[in-house]
Amino acid sequence: SVVRGSPEIAFVGLYIVAAEFRGRGFGRQLWDEALGKFDGLTLGLDAVPEQEATYASDGFASAYGNARFSAEARELPDPEPDAGILPSSSVPFDQLVAFDAAHYFGPRPAFLRTWITGEGRQSLIATDGTSITGFVASRPTRTGNRIGPFFAANATIAGNLLLELATGLTGPVSID
């Protein structure tokens, strides 16, 4: 997939060719087509270690490692009461876009609107009473829920957002 998150940025990730079609160049064709559509943009890549040499041949370099963390929603502790956590719909959308843009690579209102309003999706904000101090969203998967985007001013706010979000979810909750 290639997702254009803003006018200047796109992310590439997760393309898999079925085993019976591997070795015929289909993966490379998909890769070249995806990169060609976004020539001139800054590209981010969700990469698998086994393909790092392939990605490097196209100019990508590893910036950091990534790990997935998962837990059953019901096994997480309760959130702190009165932590200033509200549904994201409780603030004007332009404020949410501005907060997200300050933590991403720029504004992405169309992506954000779709991301937080799709079926089964949930999103929360943290507020100090005057401004947004955190934002988290979840989406359903075949096996549970994925968390992201997820931005917070500090670890306490992040913890409260995650735990509050988990109270409305069932099954595994994953973040990576």
Locations of regions flagged by a protein language model:
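A generic fold-level signal
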Residues: 61-63, 80, 142
